[in-house]
Amino acid sequence: YDLSKNCRLRGGICYIGKCPRRFFRSGSCSRGNVCCLRFG
């Protein structure tokens, strides 16, 4: 099961560590990355 693909399908981006400004964490991606979605 590809968490990274699932993240992108929801319009998110995978980041290492924490999400950048104007993004919020919404789950995980592969290899410990986090799925970040844009506010708004």
UniProtKB/Swiss-Prot annotation:
GO terms for molecular function: identical protein binding. GO terms for cellular component: membrane; microvesicle. It comes from the Eukaryota. The keyword Disulfide bond applies. The modification Glycine amide is found at G40. Disulfide bonds join C7-C35, C14-C29, C19-C36. Has antimicrobial activity against the Gram-positive bacteria methicillin-resistant S.aureus ATCC 33591 and L.monocytogenes EGD, the Gram-negative bacterium E.coli ML53p and the yeast C.albicans 820. Has no hemolytic activity towards human erythrocytes. Monomer. Homodimer. This is Beta-defensin 1. It comes from Emys orbicularis (European pond turtle).
